[in-house]
């Protein structure tokens, strides 16, 4: 049995991972949260929920004593809080004798070009000085391109720049920039497997489902959905903070006020397109090599299952 503490365990990605761990019925999961609310997973057997104060390292270390693995799912919407809470969690984990630590990554390989991800780079530097850790990096979740259809219990869904539902897409230049797509189900499975992996965890914990260019993904969309209206934007305009397209996907998130939703969505899409062009979403296959028997769901298989036969 592995004792796992999940920091920020009420989020949608964390909940997908927790479900996969609990389904194995051989691990003990503790969800750590600052607010007196429960994770969607908290009704499951084998989970306990503890309210913590991330500013109090000594009490946090006491909670973590006896824990084998800490998985962190903090968001970076408040940069200073994310950095402070992450560092305190790392310090408390070391003090408590935690063996393995996974910081709040769960996405891109490079974070500096994505404002709400920048705290992750500071935490990587901090971890290099003081702890053994792995960075789980699945790239972008394939599931997003199935919007509005969901195949998971928890993952928050929004339309994206390649919009299969409305047969339209926005790309950078000719769309020859690569990104990695991995289903959230595959990522959650790999994390659960990693808990039981007896070898050394890699620092670079890439999880590679499908490596694909934006142009190839658009062609897949046209194969499944018919012709798409494709708009190309320039990297130069993106660098100047401009998205010169006739539309922009509107993202939904509990932290996005309705009155600012369009502005926030446009900003996120600009930074996402820039980061794709900079190679931020191409990840390694470290965990693929360590778990060679696991078969990942390809982007084509997943999206065919979602879209084939849809009007």
Language-model segments: residues:
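Terminal hydrophobic/aromatic helix or amphipathic segment near a protein terminus
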Residues: 205, 218-280
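Short, amphipathic alpha-helical "lid/cap" segments that border enzyme active or binding sites
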Residues: 61, 184-192, 296-304
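NAD(P)-cofactor binding segment of oxidoreductase domains
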Residues: 65-101, 115-126
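Oxidoreductase cofactor-interface core, primarily capturing Rossmann-like NAD(P)-dependent enzymes
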Residues: 2-28, 32-45, 55-58, 80, ...
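Conserved Rossmann-fold cofactor-binding substructure of NAD(P)-dependent oxidoreductases
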Residues: 43, 48-69
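Short beta-strands and strand-loop turn motifs
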Residues: 71-73, 102-108, 172
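Amphipathic terminal alpha-helices
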Residues: 284-311
């Amino acid at each position: 049995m592995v004792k796992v503490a999940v920091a920020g365990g009420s989020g949608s990605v964390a909940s997908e991972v927790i479900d996969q761990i609990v389904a194995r019925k051989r691990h003990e999961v503790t969800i750590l949260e600052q607010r007196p609310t429960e994770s969607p997973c908290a009704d499951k057997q084998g989970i306990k929920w503890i309210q913590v104060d991330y500013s109090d390292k000594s009490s946090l270390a006491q909670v973590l004593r006896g824990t084998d693995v800490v998985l962190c799912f903090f968001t970076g919407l408040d940069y200073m809080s994310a950095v402070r809470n992450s560092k305190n969690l790392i310090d408390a984990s070391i003090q408590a004798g935690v063996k393995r630590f996974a910081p709040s990554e769960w996405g891109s390989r490079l974070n500096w070009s994505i404002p709400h991800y920048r705290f992750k780079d500071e935490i990587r530097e901090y971890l290099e000085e003081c702890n053994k850790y792995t960075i789980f990096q699945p790239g972008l979740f394939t599931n997003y391109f199935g919007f509005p259809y969901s195949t998971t219990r928890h993952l928050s869904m929004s339309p994206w720049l390649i919009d299969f539902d409305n047969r339209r897409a926005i790309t950078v230049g000719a769309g020859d920039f690569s990104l990695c797509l991995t289903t959230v189900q595959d990522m959650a499975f790999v994390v659960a497997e990693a808990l039981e992996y007896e070898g050394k965890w890699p620092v670079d914990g890439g999880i590679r489902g499908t490596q694909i260019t934006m142009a190839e993904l658009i062609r897949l969309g046209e194969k499944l959905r018919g012709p798409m209206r494709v708009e190309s934007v320039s990297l130069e305009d993106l660098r100047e903070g401009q998205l010169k397209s006739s539309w922009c996907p509107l993202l939904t998130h509990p932290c996005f006020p309705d009155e600012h939703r369009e502005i926030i969505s446009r900003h996120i899409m600009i930074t996402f397109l820039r980061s794709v062009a900079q190679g931020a979403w191409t990840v390694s296959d470290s965990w693929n090599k360590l778990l060679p028997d696991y078969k990942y769901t390809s982007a084509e298989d997943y999206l065919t299952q979602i879209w084939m036969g849809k009007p």
